């Protein structure tokens, strides 16, 4: 019986760690890469480049190659901070061209079942940013999932005593969906129709 070479097995194992990639898909991808050595080389170089150049912005925690990121270093409205779960959600909001403030990436949501509490998120850093002054509004743009809603309510309760406006994206984004997958027009409508909490 023919067995997979150990290097191929390792590649398949690493590919399976990607979201939505099972054994068969990983094997198909591995064989495709083997058939096109130039793609394999380009992919490995790209992975090494991402590892060495991409980091989190020290202000908003979005992924970036420059620190601070282009949004934090630019001339955006610093009086408004949009709080998102991750950098993918930030990019989805940016595609709408409807928001012109700054961002704060939590790097997750409160999820007791997964053992993630508020202290595992970038909430302390958000409070420190607000504490430095100049922030008039925080737009909570967590996803409309159970965890996203719990995180939004936690943030609203935490921020209310600070005397700043707290708003939530309007529910034009379907419940249970991730902002990352919503079209730009819907995101724009949701930003414009956001509600105060």
From Swiss-Prot:
Q: Family per UniProt?
A: Belongs to the RecR family.
- Which is an annotated Pfam family here? Toprim_4
| SUPFAM superfamilies per the UniProt record, alphabetical | Recombination protein RecR (SSF111304)
Give the HAMAP family listed for this entry.
Answer: RecR
* Residue ranges of every copy of the Toprim domain listed in the record: 79-174
The protein, known as: Recombination protein RecR
Role noted for this protein: May play a role in DNA repair. It seems to be involved in an RecBC-independent recombinational process of DNA repair. It may act with RecF and RecO.
SMART domains linked: TOPRIM (SM00493)
* Record-level Gene Ontology MF annotations: DNA binding; zinc ion binding
One Gene Ontology term of the biological-process aspect is: DNA recombination
Keywords for the protein's UniProt record, in alphabetical order = DNA damage, DNA recombination, DNA repair, Metal-binding, Zinc, Zinc-finger
Zn finger (C4-type) start-end = 57-72
Keyword Lipoprotein tagged: no
Tell me yes or no: is Cell inner membrane among this UniProt entry's keywords.
Answer: no
């Amino acid at each position: 019986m023919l067995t997979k070479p150990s290097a191929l097995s390792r590649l398949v194992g690493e590919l399976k760690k990607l979201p939505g990639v099972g054994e068969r898909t990983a094997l198909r991808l591995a064989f495709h890469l083997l058939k096109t050595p130039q793609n394999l080389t380009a992919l490995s170089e790209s992975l090494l480049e991402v590892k060495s150049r991409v980091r989190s912005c020290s202000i908003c925690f979005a992924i970036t190659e420059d620190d601070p990121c282009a949004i934090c270093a630019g001339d955006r409205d610093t009086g408004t901070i949009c709080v998102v779960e991750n950098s993918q959600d930030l990019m989805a909001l940016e595609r709408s061209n409807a928001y012109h403030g700054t961002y704060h990436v939590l790097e997750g949501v409160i999820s007791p079942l997964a053992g993630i509490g508020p202290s595992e998120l970038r909430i302390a850093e958000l409070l420190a940013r607000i504490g430095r002054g100049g922030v008039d509004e925080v737009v909570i743009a967590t996803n409309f999932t159970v965890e996203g809603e719990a995180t939004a309510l936690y943030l609203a309760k935490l921020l209310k005593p600070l005397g700043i406006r707290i708003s939530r994206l309007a529910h034009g984004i379907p419940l249970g969906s991730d902002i990352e997958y919503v079209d730009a027009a819907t995101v724009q409508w949701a930003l414009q129709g956001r509600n105060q909490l």
